[in-house]
């Protein structure tokens, strides 16, 4: 049966359950920040995740309670135990649906009925369980509107697999997308579904039954994706509620103490902030490619040499499970100008005055963090939504450039060096900075009192407060 911690919040409003995809940092943190906003409006947020995650990760603290469900692997990481994603998802559904139903029942019997379940639509079974228990549901989409709507169009059979650049041009011509997507820009899960069939199915199935949800929420803001957000709202009733980041970085005085996500699957004690303090303003390249993507030895070698050859000081995040791939020679070369760490407080680093550029995989959370801090990007996408986001960064938002692979699909150090120099020293460096600053202001306005996303959050909270 699902278990519950001691209450952390003092609000007397209705209980909101938050169910992100288990052990996915990029899905959990935005939902937690949304929960903090709901707590400000008087609701009582409860984080629901797997027993294994709760046993290995410190709880987020006030204003959250925590509740546990099972993915069938209470004593081990499910994704590690079942590396086949399709098999893990089936196991997660079987155990998760049962224990979520038990949790909803036990909470109701204890006099704490859930008013609404905010869930990740990568877990569509959660909607069915909640509705069977008489609990309202709100789907929380954690990717940009541009990518979401492509998945939605496939689910609605208005687009067929594989999705082609011609299909994307049709969306652009209709005014649905703000930029024309080429062969390297269409989300790869639907552009080449045969390569990752489980992820393709999971992405599309987010939209199956979405019309049955009471609310649909998107972690974006209308000024960033005006055409896409408008289409999402007219087609799926989706409301933008982002960027869902700690309010300290949004200059929102209503939640002054909200300075961190508060739920970290990765930890580090490396003093990178002290190192940053010693660097000149806007001189440092932050390099991080997320918590999921992996590089082979050759790619790391090219990336590292490109960084060193750029002549810029750099902070390079190489996860501990990737560190062994770095050669001794490359480590010594990096020591001259850079600092290699297994983890860094990314938001803090991006907000630091020394940071001048972010070389990123362009996952959605990392991109929003760069936008909120006005930091130009060098995009080096890997999969999922990243190629599409990279296209928007370079061609529509004008806040950076994209690293191009050679004709054989190989990363070359010269290209890494070229892109860093272009953003940091090139003729358009002031354009990149100006565009990043413009979007930063728009992002903050959307989340400050009376902004577009803030209004949507307030309306959602009011709906479930009575």
Curated annotation (Swiss-Prot):
Its EC number is 2.4.1.-. UDP-alpha-D-glucose binds at residues 27, 142, 291, 343-344, 361, 364-366, 369, 385-386. Induction: Induced by exposition to gamma ray. It comes from Oryza sativa subsp. japonica (Rice). UDP binds at residues 291, 343-344, 361, 365-366, 369. The gene is UGT79. It holds the Pfam family UDPGT. GO terms for biological process: detoxification. One of its GO terms (molecular function) is nucleotide binding. The keyword Magnesium does not apply. The active site is at 27 (proton acceptor), 120 (charge relay). Belongs to the UDP-glycosyltransferase family. GO terms for cellular component: cytoplasm. This is UDP-glycosyltransferase 79. InterPro entries: UDP_glucos_trans, UDP_glycos_trans_CS. Keywords: Detoxification, Glycosyltransferase, Nucleotide-binding, Transferase.
């Amino acid at each position: 049966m699902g278990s519950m911690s001691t209450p952390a919040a003092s609000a007397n409003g209705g209980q909101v359950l938050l169910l992100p995809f288990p052990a996915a940092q990029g899905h959990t943190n935005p939902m937690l920040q949304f929960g903090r906003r709901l707590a400000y409006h008087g609701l009582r947020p409860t984080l629901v995740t797997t027993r294994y995650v709760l046993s290995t990760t410190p709880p987020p603290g006030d204003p959250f309670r925590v509740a546990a469900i099972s993915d069938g692997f209470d004593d081990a990481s499910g994704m590690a135990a079942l590396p086949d994603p399709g098999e893990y998802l089936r196991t997660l559904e079987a155990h998760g649906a049962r224990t979520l139903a038990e949790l909803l029942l036990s909470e109701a019997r204890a006099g704490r009925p859930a008013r609404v379940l905010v869930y990740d639509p990568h877990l569509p079974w959660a909607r069915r369980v909640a509705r069977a228990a008489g609990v309202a549901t709100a789907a929380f989409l954690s990717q940009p509107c541009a990518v979401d709507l492509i998945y939605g169009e496939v689910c609605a059979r208005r687009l067929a697999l594989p999705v082609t650049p011609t299909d994307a041009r049709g969306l652009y011509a209709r005014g649905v997308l703000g930029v024309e997507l080429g062969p390297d820009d269409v989300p790869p899960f639907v552009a080449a579904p045969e390569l990752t069939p489980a992820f393709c199915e999971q992405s599309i199935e987010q939209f199956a039954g979405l019309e049955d949800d009471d609310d649909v929420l998107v972690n974006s803001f209308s000024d960033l994706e005006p055409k896409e957000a408008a289409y999402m709202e007219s087609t799926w009733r989706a409301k933008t509620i982002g960027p869902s980041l700690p309010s300290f970085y949004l200059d929102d005085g209503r939640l002054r103490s909200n300075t961190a996500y508060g739920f970290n699957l990765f930890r580090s004690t490396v003093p990178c902030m002290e190192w940053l303090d010693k660097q000149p303003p806007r001189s440092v390249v932050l390099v991080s490619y997320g918590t999921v993507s992996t590089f082979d030895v050759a790619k790391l070698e090219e990336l590292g040499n490109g960084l060193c050859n750029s002549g810029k000081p750099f902070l390079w995040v190489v996860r501990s499970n990737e560190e062994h791939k770095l050669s001794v020679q490359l480590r010594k070369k990096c020591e001259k100008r850079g600092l290699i760490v297994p983890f860094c407080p990314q938001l803090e680093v991006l907000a630091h005055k020394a940071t001048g550029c972010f070389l990123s995989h362009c996952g959605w959370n990392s991109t929003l963090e760069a936008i909120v801090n006005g930091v130009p990007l060098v995009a080096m996408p890997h999969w999922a939504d990243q190629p599409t986001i990279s296209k928007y960064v370079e061609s529509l938002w004008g806040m950076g450039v994209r690293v191009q692979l050679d004709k054989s699909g190989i990363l070359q150090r010269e290209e890494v060096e070229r892109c860093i120099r272009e953003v940091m020293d090139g003729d358009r460096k002031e354009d990149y900075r100006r565009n990043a600053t413009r979007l930063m202001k728009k992002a903050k306005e959307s989340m400050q009192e009376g902004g577009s996303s803030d209004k949507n959050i307030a309306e959602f909270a009011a709906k479930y407060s009575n």
